Amino acid sequence: MEVMKMRCRRTVKIIIDIAMYLIFVALMQEYLWSDGLHEWLGTTLFALFIAHTIFNFRWYQSLFKGKYTPARTTSAIINIALLAAMLCCMVSSVLVSGKVFAFLNLGGARIGRTLHLVSTAWVFVLMSLHLGLHLAPFANKLKKHRQFLWTGRIIAVLLAAYGVYVFVDRAFYEELFYLTEFKFFDTDKSAALYFL
């Protein structure tokens, strides 16, 4: 019974993580959705993030326990930075909301928009690094199957190279360091290209 419970918990965690990433990628293409749908998707994302945090609360409890290796230190820095970026994203979302949280009438839309632009960019980068770290155990399992190991390595290198290309081509660094106040959407391009 206990094993079944652990498997169920692990499955739910994986579903939440996949759903979070897919929703966030969709939200990055803000010009494809109406404001209302964008905000509701964002609200769903933050609900999933809260669930994700609850499921992984033991990790926070273990922060000040045990020895810190370089790998653990790197993981902790990325996770804490991701938490901070997500919190900034949540707060800024409420400040700029024109639909879901408009009834709060908090004001601060100008600073909220700036914070939202920068924090979402950092969330995207940190979330990708976070996922990369959690894929490491799966990569270790591939060592038993050499044919899959090399295939996996080639795919990983190609994805990393494409990621660097897109990062530079779309000037993503401008959003990370607030070098631009606007995110442009090329309507001549297929919408599908913005998800790659």
Q: Where do the model's predicted regions map?
A:
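Membrane-embedded alpha-helical bundles that constitute the cytochrome b-like, heme-associated redox core
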Residues: 2-196
